[in-house]
């Protein structure tokens, strides 16, 4: 991984250590030590200054062996090697350090009992290796793994590490993102190999790996496991999806994710899906309970662009192939001002449209520009906007439009094809109302990776969405919102030491209506209520609901149950309105992104937030 890649970077210092005797010889001469030796072959590091200190130094000119004992410290640039004993055999071009071996570069530190290095072959090994790596100091952004820790320090242990100029291999390796002992979380593997890639990143392969939680719970990891700065899907996704307008309900979904291709610029993930509730009793047979998903991404760094392809087949029933397939291809370009241009084609895209429920957009072809968040001077106001043009094929009402959601659902059976121009903007500002004073006695995090930021904030905003359709219809919505967000408690005590409350009210002016169902606005005035509360230890429960104040109906709701620790957590959430849910494993800093495999649809009743 990127942090451990420092090992051979630091150990490479010893590859330059052949100049050590020359530097030490000067000190030895002052003490009446060995006579000057031939240093013709030692000029490779003439431009580098190597300093060596120890309690005792000797040089055997006949055997060409230099030895230092007692509090040995060798410095080369920013690198420091410490040991009880150091022996450099110039004839064999080999260095051996023994006893409390320590290699340090800035905040990176690696220790062991014995280090052996062959200058000629540029190979070596370190026994009983352990240490910590400050991954915040490493610059190879594509290297594995970033992130096992928000503290930016990764600790590791290995029985032995073999290394050369481009690879290292560890035996019985344990990695942890926990600064305390015993660690809450460890990644264990009997064999870990890291290989330097052409782009400067490292490929980490862990064989027969495990995640160990609190030394009592063990979860297997894939044989081939890679960590880097790129988001990727977790090894296994578990979620629930039992709501679909066309009755293709899948229920519980078990989805292993296999990375068939992955480098910093290209990735291909193939994800078989198993629907246990459809395996028995389905009229379509056993294959109706099996699905398949594929995700492909291609980054073009020189063009600041990324192309992605998603496809999902919900049941291997070829007679209904067109109905069961969902797909999307998208090309995104980051502009010089920090905005983003996107070109998209989507087939059978799912949208959640509030009181209109799930809607299927059969075909959508379009382009959009999303601005970065712009701070307006010293006002504290944040502005963002979005412009989009699409050609859409979806269920709709081209002529007379039913503004009542129930009538619209009952009377809309035909697909229509129209072009749409959509403009949207948001203007927000947050006001801190209260925060507790900071003290030196504030306890360190216990159930969270980082200290909890406590306080009460007032949030205000104005948003506008304008949509124009090629049949002459238009939909306009401009609204204001105000809300309170409160976080009380540091989440370190055993009970009721964390409470998060959120209340947001919004109201606006609605004119016209979309001819489509998927983007029709049906909720003009709404209230959002949410809370997250610690019960005992790492256990928290929460809920969030959105209520249409004009009809009194519950538009959306989600319930959460979480088990959170410093370095990992489990989360179970369920939405009875959408009839969907998910079980997620969070490993702090580990770059698994459950959202990449989630079935959650886009919200269609507003313009997508910039």
Predicted regions and their residues:
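Long, low-hydrophobicity, solvent-exposed regions enriched in small/turn-prone and acidic residues
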Residues: 2-69, 73-80, 92-94, 104-106, ...
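A low-complexity, Ser/Thr/Gly/Pro-enriched, surface-exposed linker/loop concept
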Residues: 87-88
């Amino acid at each position: 991984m990127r942090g451990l890649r420092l090992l051979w970077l630091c150990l490479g210092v010893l590859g330059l250590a052949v100049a050590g005797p020359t530097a030490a010889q000067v000190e030895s001469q002052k003490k009446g030590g060995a006579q000057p030796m031939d240093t013709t072959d030692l000029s490779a590091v003439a431009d580098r200054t190597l300093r060596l200190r120890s309690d005792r130094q000797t040089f055997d000119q006949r055997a060409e062996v230099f030895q230092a004992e007692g509090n040995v410290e060798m410095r080369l640039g920013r690198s420091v090697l410490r040991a009880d004993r150091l022996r450099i055999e110039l004839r064999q071009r080999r260095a051996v350090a023994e006893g409390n071996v320590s290699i340090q570069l800035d905040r990176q530190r690696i220790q062991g009992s014995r280090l052996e290095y062959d200058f000629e072959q540029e190979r070596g090994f370190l026994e009983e290796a352990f240490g910590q790596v400050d991954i915040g100091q490493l610059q190879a952004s594509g290297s594995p793994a970033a992130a096992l820790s928000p503290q930016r320090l990764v600790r590791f242990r290995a029985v032995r590490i073999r290394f050369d100029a481009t690879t290292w291999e560890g035996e019985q390796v344990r990695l942890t993102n926990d600064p305390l002992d015993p660690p809450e979380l460890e990644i264990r593997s009997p064999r870990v190999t890291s290989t330097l890639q052409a782009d400067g990143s490292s490929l980490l392969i862990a064989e027969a790996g495990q995640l160990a939680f609190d030394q009592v719970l063990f979860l297997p990891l894939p044989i081939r496991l890679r960590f880097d700065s790129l988001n990727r899907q977790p090894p296994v996704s578990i979620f629930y999806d039992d709501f679909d307008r066309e009755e293709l309900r899948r229920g519980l979904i078990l989805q292993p994710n296999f990375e068939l291709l992955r480098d910093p610029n290209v990735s291909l993930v193939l994800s078989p899906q198993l629907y246990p509730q459809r395996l028995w009793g389905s009229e379509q047979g056993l294959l109706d309970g099996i699905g398949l998903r594929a995700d492909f991404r291609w980054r073009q760094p020189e063009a600041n662009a990324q192309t992605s392809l998603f496809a999902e087949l919900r049941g291997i029933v070829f007679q209904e192939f067109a109905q069961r397939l969902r797909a999307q291809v998208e090309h995104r370009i980051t502009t010089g001002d920090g905005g983003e241009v996107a070109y998209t084609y989507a087939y059978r895209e799912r949208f959640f449209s509030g009181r209109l429920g799930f809607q299927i957009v059969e075909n959508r072809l379009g382009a959009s520009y999303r601005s970065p968040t712009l701070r307006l001077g010293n006002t504290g106001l944040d502005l963002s906007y979005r412009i989009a043009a699409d050609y859409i094929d979806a269920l709709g009402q081209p002529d007379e439009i039913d503004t009542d959601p129930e009538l619209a659902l009952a009377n809309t059976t035909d697909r229509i094809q129209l072009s749409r121009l959509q403009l949207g903007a948001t203007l927000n500002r947050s006001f801190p109302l209260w925060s507790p004073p900071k003290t030196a006695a504030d306890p360190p995090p216990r159930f969270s990776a980082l200290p909890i930021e406590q306080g009460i904030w007032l949030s205000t905003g104005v948003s506008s969405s304008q949509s124009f359709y090629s049949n002459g219809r238009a939909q306009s919505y401009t609204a204001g919102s105000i809300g309170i967000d409160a976080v009380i408690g540091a989440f370190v005590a055993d009970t009721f030491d964390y409470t998060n409350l959120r209340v947001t009210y919004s109201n606006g002016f609605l004119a016209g209506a979309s001819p489509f169902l998927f983007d029709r606005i049906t909720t003009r005035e709404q209230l959002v209520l949410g809370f997250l509360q610690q019960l005992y230890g790492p256990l928290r429960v929460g809920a969030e609901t959105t209520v249409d104040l004009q009809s009194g109906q519950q538009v959306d709701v989600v319930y959460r149950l979480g088990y959170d620790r410093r370095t990992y957590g489990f989360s179970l959430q369920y939405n009875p309105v959408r009839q969907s849910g998910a079980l997620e494993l969070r490993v702090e800093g580990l770059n698994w992104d459950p959202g990449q495999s989630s079935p959650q649809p886009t919200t269609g009743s507003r313009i997508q937030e910039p």
